[in-house]
Amino acid sequence: MLYPSVDKLQKTVPSKYTIVTVAAKRARQIQDGKRVKVANPKSYKPVGKALEELFSGEVVVTNQPQD
């Protein structure tokens, strides 16, 4: 079972595609050695940890135009 669920995540980030993109980028950072911002994450995989960070508000989505 995925924690947090996609439905819960969509309350903070409305687009499923944005959730996937942000979680993937953050998971790569975690995998490359960046510190996890959530204390005692339930997941042991980088993607799960990234989703938990997104749900808790530790990772914030900002819209920045691409050049």
UniProtKB/Swiss-Prot annotation:
Keyword Transcription attributed: yes
Reactions mediated catalytically: RNA(n) + a ribonucleoside 5'-triphosphate = RNA(n+1) + diphosphate
Gene3D superfamilies per UniProt: 3.90.940.10
MF terms (GO), sorted A to Z: DNA binding; DNA-directed RNA polymerase activity
Database matches in InterPro entries: DNA-dir_RNA_pol_omega (IPR003716), Pol_omega/Rpo6/RPB6 (IPR006110), RPB6/omega-like_sf (IPR036161)
GO cellular component term, pick one: DNA-directed RNA polymerase complex
One GO-annotated biological process of the protein: DNA-templated transcription
Its EC number(s): 2.7.7.6
Top EC class of this enzyme: transferase
Keywords: DNA-directed RNA polymerase, Nucleotidyltransferase, Transcription, Transferase
Transmembrane segment boundaries: none
Biological role: Promotes RNA polymerase assembly. Latches the N- and C-terminal regions of the beta' subunit thereby facilitating its interaction with the beta and alpha subunits.
Family membership noted in the UniProt record: Belongs to the RNA polymerase subunit omega family.
Subunit structure: The RNAP catalytic core consists of 2 alpha, 1 beta, 1 beta' and 1 omega subunit. When a sigma factor is associated with the core the holoenzyme is formed, which can initiate transcription.
Protein name: DNA-directed RNA polymerase subunit omega
UniProt organism field: Exiguobacterium sibiricum (strain DSM 17290 / CCUG 55495 / CIP 109462 / JCM 13490 / 255-15)
